[in-house]
Amino acid sequence: MFKNALRRAGVAAPRISRVAQRGYAEAKATPTEVTSILEERIRGVSGEANLNETGRVLSVGDGIARVFGLNNIQAEELVEFASGVKGMALNLEAGQVGIVLFGSDRLVKEGETVKRSGSIVDVPVGPALLGRVVDALGNPIDGKGPIETEFRIRAQVKAPGILPRTSVNEPMQTGLKAVDALVPIGRGQRELIIGDRQTGKTQIAIDTILNQKRWNYGQDEKKKLYCVYVAVGQKRSTVAQLVQTLEHHDALKYSIIVAATASEAAPLQYLAPFTGTAMGEWFRDNGKGALIVFDDLSKQAVAYRQMSLLLRRPPGREAYPGDVFYLHSRLLERAAKMNEREGGGSLTALPIIETQGGDVSAYIPTNVISITDGQIFLEAELFYKGIRPAINVGLSVSRVGSAAQVKAMKQVAGSLKLFLAQYREVAAFAQFGSDLDASTKQTLTRGERLTLLLKQKQASPMSSEEMVPLIYAGVNGYIDNIPVKQVEKFEAEFVSYLHANESDLLKDIAATGELSKENLEKLKSITENFVGSFAK
């Protein structure tokens, strides 16, 4: 009406200026348009900026920065903010890039410039890292100065294909009687260590590293096994204690420690296992043997879940992203035994998973069990009873390790696992206190002593030639009449007796890796004589 009245009066209607129109549109902008408005304003501010190579921070918080620009960026490329903080591009979306920060997000401000580095996350590798403690990006954190190495490898690379691999056929000895006899591990295998918190999972891994000392200070390069220990989400005091233990036992010289502790940003905890694997792969690809321990992958999965949810990726079971299986499979598939044409190197993986209340059927445990070649299941109940390592013989299995087991061990421990499983069953039944026949009593007597024989103190790994006579004595009933409280004493005295008087037999087992008929007869008479004198 107002416009018509003006027209009749011959007066032109007032025009709303474009600026006013834009202001009106912005005032009524929907939340989805806010980003494009911000982009326009940033373009206005930095008209000359090259948005292909640089960008500006739109928003930052919870360790995630959303950046406008960086049009040429690659997935998982390193970027650097003007404040000096580094990050990694994980989400490449239309109009913006989701970047996870490797430092504190308090240092990053909105509108700050971000630059491409041009390189996917890569880490230093090679023998120069042995004896060092590094962070998830390979930077030294032990105060021993910079790492002088000419080799750098991408942290995330494809696993070896099918043809370059060969089947697991060499033993990887842990020095633990319960593991080497019941769930043997071979070079190139992935053996999961799973159990509740405080059940001795890390200790099995540490003892395995300590046991490599007997070969790593020798001359035979093929027998050496270089160790990489990846600490994810652990307390700094725990990592410091581990370094101290390895130094005390002279094992740090052939080990690399990658630490992404609980106080580090989630992206670093996610990246650390890949960094450690790249370092282990250098040894594998150069015809050497390497062992990597992931302690633990549950915390890596939690860090990845945190990042994914903050990046607005859709959640799945237990709020983990849909590709959490791929996260662990692409990591563990990099452990392999290479064929002779590829140099014959190997990378053995010991991933650790922490369960809640013994629930092995949770999402992450079942994922990793299906990826690995077997698992060592540790039970809190056994641990509290003083049976350490607290390995549940019934649930623990090694799917490929038996092909790599030392022949002498296979000869003496063949029936051990089945017998211990029978003992557990009978022991549970015997609790009801019913009358037992002679054979059941015999099973209980021998089973109790065998269980004690498999116990072992921390940081005291044994060689296979020391284990074989002990397990032979236990399986064949030579210690059935020895009192339960005397089993530990028998073990110590028998081993020292063999070293003092029968060192030729031990050397022969160590050299050949098997028990000949002659040596078997010899071992039988030695054991009978020693048990007879010990009982007196």
From Swiss-Prot:
GO terms for cellular component: mitochondrial inner membrane; proton-transporting ATP synthase complex. Its main location: mitochondrion. Pfam families: ATP-synt_ab (PF00006), ATP-synt_ab_C (PF00306), ATP-synt_ab_N (PF02874). InterPro entries: ATP_synth_asu-like_sf (IPR023366), ATP_synth_asu_C (IPR000793), ATP_synth_asu_C_sf (IPR038376), ATP_synth_F1_a_nt-bd_dom (IPR033732), ATP_synth_F1_asu (IPR005294), ATPase_a/bsu_AS (IPR020003), ATPase_F1/V1/A1_a/bsu_N (IPR004100), ATPase_F1/V1/A1_a/bsu_N_sf (IPR036121). It is found in: Mitochondrion inner membrane. ATP binds at G195, D196, R197, Q198, T199, G200, K201, T202. It comes from the Eukaryota. GO terms for biological process: proton motive force-driven ATP synthesis. Keywords: ATP synthesis, ATP-binding, CF(1), Hydrogen ion transport, Ion transport, Membrane, Mitochondrion, Mitochondrion inner membrane, Nucleotide-binding, Transit peptide, Transport. Residues 1-24 form a transit peptide. GO terms for molecular function: ADP binding; ATP binding; proton-transporting ATP synthase activity, rotational mechanism. It is a peripheral membrane protein. Mitochondrial membrane ATP synthase (F(1)F(0) ATP synthase or Complex V) produces ATP from ADP in the presence of a proton gradient across the membrane which is generated by electron transport complexes of the respiratory chain. F-type ATP synthases consist of two structural domains, F(1) - containing the extramembraneous catalytic core, and F(0) - containing the membrane proton channel, linked together by a central stalk and a peripheral stalk. PANTHER family: ATP SYNTHASE SUBUNIT ALPHA, MITOCHONDRIAL (PTHR48082:SF2). F-type ATP synthases have 2 components, the catalytic core F(1) and the membrane-embedded component F(0), linked together by a central stalk and a peripheral stalk. The central stalk, also called rotor shaft, is often seen as part of F(1). The peripheral stalk is seen as part of F(0). F(0) contains the membrane channel next to the rotor. F-type ATP synthases form dimers but each monomer functions independently in ATP generation. NCBIfam families: atpA, PRK13343.1. Belongs to the ATPase alpha/beta chains family. This is ATP synthase subunit alpha, mitochondrial. The gene is ATP1.
